[in-house]
């Protein structure tokens, strides 16, 4: 269940995040040594790269000198927005970028990760091409995935060490990951929990109420926001992150996700799967700062739920 703040509103608004991570100087030090103490695990080459990219400021002045003499009372600021104005793509929006991570909003129809059969029309490939503008050997590292048909927020790492930190500590680092969906029919309950064992057979994920020795335990918490026009608008909170988990659990409840032909939906009024990852909150893998990202519900979702 989410450890972040619960959203009581059915219409969340995008939240802005501070532009800088700020460290207060309490004793004399050189900038390089100061940053290596404050940013656990960072290398000297990484600090030099940050300086070269002109994203480090001392008392609001960009500083590129690694041995800059800091004095008590000064503030060191690290910009958390790097060149995202240069990024434009019809299927992918760059929400946040710093030296370690990228947060993006993916449109439905785009694969998260490159595959043997599809290498270019993927979020991973698009972002690889973007980061190579800074250095030809740069690339992004996969941390988690969204189904091709699902839209919403997701995160990539910019180096292997950050990727490993995120993957190995995912359940401790991520405090809130929430989805919104439109499902068929009127939900019987305002809120509840679905638990089952999910078995992945590649083309289809099977759900079982008991452990058959092959499945992985999955837990989905849901809250019904609105019922209208034979549909229900539902917020979903994942306690586990299994393949197709939400889609299978909504089918288990007898209310398949609208547009999901694979898992029981008989209607497709939006021409897409009605599932969107609208909230992602986590502790930054390096600075340990709490990061909160939230997008509005898709406009098409709101239109379908307007009472006629």
Residue ranges and their predicted role:
Residues 269-277:
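Active-site-adjacent capping/gating segments
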Residues 1-193, 197-202, 300-304:
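RNA pseudouridine synthases
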Residues 209-210, 258-267:
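Short, surface-exposed loop/helix-turn segments at secondary-structure junctions
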Residues 94, 183, 221-224, 257:
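Conserved hydrophobic positions within beta-strands
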């Amino acid at each position: 269940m989410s450890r972040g703040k619960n959203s009581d509103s059915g219409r969340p608004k995008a939240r802005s995040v501070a532009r800088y991570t700020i460290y207060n100087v309490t004793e004399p030090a050189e900038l390089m040594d100061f940053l290596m103490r404050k940013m656990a695990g960072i290398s000297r080459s990484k600090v030099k790269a940050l300086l070269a990219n002109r994203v480090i400021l001392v008392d609001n002045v960009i500083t590129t000198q690694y041995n800059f003499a800091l004095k008590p009372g000064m503030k060191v600021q690290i910009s958390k927005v790097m060149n995202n104005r240069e990024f434009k793509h019809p299927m992918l929006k760059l929400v946040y970028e710093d030296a370690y991570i990228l947060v993006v909003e993916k449109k439905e129809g785009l694969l998260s990760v490159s595959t043997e059969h599809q290498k270019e029309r993927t979020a991973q490939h698009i972002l690889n091409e973007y980061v190579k503008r800074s250095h030809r050997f740069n690339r992004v590292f996969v941390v988690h995935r969204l189904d091709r048909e699902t839209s919403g927020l997701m995160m990539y790492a910019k180096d292997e060490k950050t990727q490993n930190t995120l993957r190995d500590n995912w359940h401790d680092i991520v405090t809130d990951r929430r989805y919104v969906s439109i499902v068929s029919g009127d939900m019987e309950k305002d809120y509840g929990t679905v638990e089952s064992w999910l078995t992945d057979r590649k083309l289809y994920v099977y759900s079982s109420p008991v452990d058959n020795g092959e499945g992985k335990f999955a837990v989905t918490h849901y809250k019904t926001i609105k019922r209208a026009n034979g549909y229900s608008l539902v917020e979903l909170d994942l306690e586990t992150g299994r393949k197709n988990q939400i889609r299978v659990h909504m089918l288990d409840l007898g209310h398949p996700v609208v547009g999901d032909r694979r898992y029981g939906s008989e209607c497709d009024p939006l021409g897409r799967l009605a599932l969107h990852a609208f909230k992602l909150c986590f502790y930054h893998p390096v600075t340990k700062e709490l990061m909160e990202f939230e997008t509005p519900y898709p406009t098409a979702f709101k239109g379908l739920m307007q009472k006629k």
